[in-house]
Amino acid sequence: MRVPSAKLLSALGSGWQVPAALRRLYADVVWLQQLATDELRPGPGRIRTSVRMAFISAVGAALMAALHVDSALGPVTLWVALYASTSRLTASEGLIMIVVYAATLIASVFLAGVLTDVPWMLLPFFGVATALGLYALNKLQLGGAWFNVVVGFLDTFYLCAFDPKNFGWSVAYSFSGIALAIGVLVAFDMVLWPDPAERRLLRSLADTLDRQGQRLAAIGRAYLDPLAVAVLPQPAGVSVLSSQLPLLERARRELGDPQREAILLAAVTTTERIHIEIERLLAVARDDVPRDIRLRLRPEMNGVLQTLGAALQHQAHRAATGLGPSDDSTDEELNTAIRSSLDTLQEREQLALSERPPAGAPAIANIAAFNLGLRRIGLRLLNKPLGDVHGLAFPQDMRSGATPSGGADPALMRHSAKLGLAATLAYVVGVASHRSELAVIVWTAVIAGLPTYGATLRKMILRMVGAVIGGLLGLLMIFVVSPNFESLGSYLLAFFIALFVAAYVGLSSGRLAYAGQQGGVSFVLAYASLSPNVNVHEPLWRVWGIFLGLVIVTLVFLLITPEYAGKAIVPRLTRILHAALELLRPASGMTEQRVQEINMDVTLDLTQVLGIAEDARMEGRHSGIVPDSVVEVAGTLRRIVHHLSGIATGRLAMPQTALPAEIQTARAGCDTAVRYHLQSWLEVLEDEHGPDRRRILEVAAHFTPDDLAVPLAELNEYLSGSGLGALASWPAAARSLLLAELESYSRLVVLVTELDHQFVEIPAAGAR
């Protein structure tokens, strides 16, 4: 009889105590198994994308070998561009990139020749040039192959140190390799094999929603199983948000359409919030309490689960078909069915609970929590079409991705300075070793230091693992392929196989992605050559250089002012709250254009907040924040800003309309109440000591339900009485705007109250 390993340990005789080391080993094995299952599961388009990345890289490497371009920087540039690109590469952008590469390499040849004679200036210049170059690229939001502009510039100084008389030829080969890499990428992105990010994102959303529907159904079956035989799903180890955010950013750059960007962002946020609510339902369902009360509600709960499943299926279909205009009749039917089933369940629940004796308190609390989760999913997340942005208008001439032009970014300056120091230390180590093959130590310091927040140690460990695996794979190809096959086809096939594996792993979440990406870089550096090469010494030195570069970057980032996600998220939430308050107290020069600009700025900030939440998942308790609560706050703030911008736009449309004194007083009271709550949270974030749990709890304790409900009740009372008759003489458009404003206030009361509760949950347990 086969006994599962988990039961085997518990079934051991009581006379033998399992050693703690064995228990830890078993736990680690189970964790690795779960990690591999979660991360390496085929997703929508994952195999296709991996094949595309590997094929393009292999074709580029084979082309460079056929043309006798003796530089590993070309294949590396192509691989880095494929996994780190923020958008597809157009012909005009590719031409600009080649011109910039040419200009920087020419300048580097001249400067290297001059500074070689003045070594005391070389190291300071090296560090400052690295920091300034990376700061400029990040400030301009230029990623992917653009980072190798700095790599190529710095590589010239390394080449000059070992061959000051003839290093110009090596620089020329580097430029040829980079130019070919860019040309290959442009050809595939634009003509041979285009891969729009929006299509990939929509496939991912559709697949995620479909999986969530299946997961919700499985939880419901197990929760309502009278015999408790059905097994609950395992808690999700990670969300798909980390894979969707890069696609969202690429789609934003490719589309250049603010309205479409907002729709995609709303869809991603809603999908993640559904994921969070379903995981909360799972946590409730795992409680071991009596089942009799839930079985009395089984027909009604099954009805709710079926309607929610149908709504999720409809949302998945909308994502799969492009998030086009919604079918109002279908949406209305689903909303009616959801509300009807939830109302029926609520009535039946109240009747059942009234008949339940006090001894069943745990079961009562459990069923109440489960049904509340169902209501949240049905009435807050599935009550609108996926991607709904509340009917906002967007500017037609504003670039989505525009960033504020004024002022320096202190966090980015610190990050760039650290990379400058790391690159300088790597240069010193490489030159002191007297090995020209260690040029990759400088490349690694720049490539591995792409801007991220938090989880430095874990990310660098993953990169080191990837470097070792990629290097070993390159050596394996040298031992197996090179002595037996000499054709260009075998060279291309070896590249394709190795880079397919690296690309597939690199498309995982942050828990494995860095290993796959770095593994691809290591393989390219170890195996790239002009002809089959059986000499392993040069590849070994390159792999060693990668390892040294990663160690240097890790030490610099861990020892010099390390930053965690909890710190990085504060300025973004602060900017969003400032934007909301600007809409609440508009200046005299406020225009509809400014309202739209505020909306787009908030959209960009929220995208960053979601990314930092994923970093916090990797950091765990060290981040000081709860990632799920951050995602909840992001979604709530997005809806608050959208409602406030709708109110501001409506008021700008009827500035000359004389309002009755009662309406003016009630509106002012609503504005004051919302402003009080938002301003209080802004002051918490701007505190010189930073937000801490005690301060957040103190602020939340001052809020009462009447803060928001009383002004709104006064406005409703007036309009329910004589106020509505007083509006009869108003123009229809003005009357509609005022009633729409009242509806927005009704939603703001709920949203601001939710925000108060969600802010309290942001600090992690034990955080200051």
Model-derived features: where do they sit?
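A transmembrane helix-and-boundary motif of multi-pass membrane transporters/channels
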Residues: 1-260, 367-371, 382-628, 632, ...
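Soluble C-terminal extramembrane regulatory/interaction domains of multi-pass membrane proteins
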Residues: 204-226, 267-393, 636-768
